[in-house]
Amino acid sequence: MAGVSDAAAPGSGGEGRRGGGGSPEQLQQDGCRGEPKTLWGSSELRPPPAGPGQPSPHQRTETLGFYESDRGRKKKRGLSDLSLLRFISAELTRGYFLEHNEAKYTERRERVYTCMRIPKELEKLMFFGIFLCLDAFLYIFTLLPLRVFLAMFRFITLPCYGLRDRRLLQPAQVCDILKGVILVICYFMMHYVDYSMMYHLIRGQSVIKLYIIYNMLEVADRLFSSFGQDILDALYWTATEPKERKRAHIGVIPHFFMAVLYVFLHAILIMVQATTLNVAFNSHNKSLLTIMMSNNFVEIKGSVFKKFEKNNLFQMSNSDIKERFTNYVLLLIVCLRNMEQFSWNPDHLWVLFPDVCMVVASEIAVDIVKHAFITKFNDITADVYSEYRASLAFDLVSSRQKNAYTDYSDSVSRRMGFIPLPLAVLLMRVVTSSIKVQGVLAYVCVVLFYCGLISLKVLNSIVLLGKSCQYVKEAKMEEKLFNPVPSASAGKPAGKPQSMFKSTHGFSTDENGSTSVTNQPVHQKDSPPSLLVTSNSDQFLTTPDGEEKDISQDSSELKHRSSKKDLLEIDRFTICGNRID
């Protein structure tokens, strides 16, 4: 009986075995019913003894384990139901702190501000450059005829005063006469080109063929411009080279015929461009004009994703200035031809006005987008356009000095690739064929119009010179204009009178101190290498911001350069449209 009572006593027997001393199979079954699997037999995990009036530890553990297990199931079920809501709430209330990456976001903001400044700075450069091209273009029609007349008058009246000088004419006067003769010869040669036949020949072609022709003409125009100024410079130097030099050229006459042929072919090329644009204007559905304008946006693809330095961007900016001014002249030619066909009816001008605005607007939009993304991808600031404008202003100011080494129109041609002679020949041909001058009153109007052009040229030159001085002063480049003139070469004998002295830029001046616009360079064979002087404006451009301190090192390295390397550099600068110094 004692054994039975002992087995039935609470806390012992079956319950005791269930609570802690059961077999492993019973423990496993209890664990499946949600009871804890902890083995209370271990001394470390044995529960504390139960107090009076409390259930045994094993019973309490079982009861609590059951309710805790049931509550855990409900909690897990609630978590599984609310997981999507909690994720959405976490996404809606999640925060972050931008100030931890302040430098990155500041740089991005500056890029946005730079892109916003690009249109203003670019158009300021374009505006200044277009007026520079206009000044060089008006020079052909206004001051060049007067200078040619003065040079011819000097040549005719020279025997009356005696031959006091070795030269019959000054180098600048020789160049002016050559320009005038080339202009007149090419003008008469253009009369043999039938504009009407060319118009109908182009109009009969398909749209795709005209699109291809227009692209080829743009490429040919750039090639002609890059090589044409070299032909003209070779002619000017051959005609004014000192006679005591060893003859190393083919002669003035072959160079002259090459220059005439170049100006004539380039004028025909521009005429074909103007004719193609005229056909696009007169097309019924304007599809050709739209395709031609969309061709400008191809420039964005070809330019934006390339590596650009400051010098490359300057060359492209000059090319854009020249291209925009040339397009303005082409639009003027198209309007003149259309107004002539409609008997100068002013109502037809308003028909052409939307197309003209579309061409101009597309050109401006393409330039802005192209320059904005080029500066963004290459980390170029918008202040670089002020440097470009100051460099162009330096060219203008230096050409007005007494020791100027070239004419300003030639300087613009070398810097921007804009050659005004072919464009002037074509405009003269179109104007004279479109406007008939008959009667005394008509000639009076022509004289008044010529006086107006001279007034416009003088006013434009004065304003440009004033603004150029301001830009040069703001860029702190005025000290480069007042370099001391080096002494004569040391390799010449002292007893021989020297009639030529080396000027600041390596060009010559006369003995009496009078200098001309196109003073000729002195032969560099006898002069020491240290007297080689580069152009100040080119040095300003080709020197990046952080390399101004290395100019002295570059000048020391210049002494060790060979003449062959210098010639290669001159050819490279010539192809790129830079100035030849």
Swiss-Prot record:
Biased composition (Polar residues): 500-522, 532-542
Biased composition annotated in UniProt, kind: Gly residues: 11-23
One term under GO cellular component: cytoplasm
Ranges of compositional bias, category Pro residues: 46-55
Region (Disordered), start-end ranges: 1-72, 484-563
Basic and acidic residues: compositionally biased ranges: 549-563
Principal subcellular localisation of the protein: cytoplasm
GO BP terms: cartilage development; cell projection organization; neural crest cell development; ossification; positive regulation of bone development; positive regulation of cartilage development; positive regulation of cilium assembly
Protein's cellular compartments: Cytoplasm, Cytoskeleton, Microtubule organizing center, Centrosome; Cytoplasm, Cytoskeleton, Cilium basal body; Membrane
Keyword Methyltransferase: no
Transmembrane segments: 125-145, 182-202, 250-270, 417-437, 439-459
Topology within the bilayer: Multi-pass membrane protein
Record keywords, A-Z: Cell projection, Chondrogenesis, Cilium, Cilium biogenesis/degradation, Cytoplasm, Cytoskeleton, Developmental protein, Differentiation, Membrane, Osteogenesis, Transmembrane, Transmembrane helix
Listed PANTHER family: TRANSMEMBRANE ANTERIOR POSTERIOR TRANSFORMATION PROTEIN 1 HOMOLOG
Function: Plays a role in primary cilia formation. May act as a downstream effector of HOXC8 during development. May be involved in cartilage and bone development. May play a role in the differentiation of cranial neural crest cells.
Family recorded in the similarity comment: Belongs to the TAPT1 family.
Name assigned to this protein: Transmembrane anterior posterior transformation protein 1 homolog
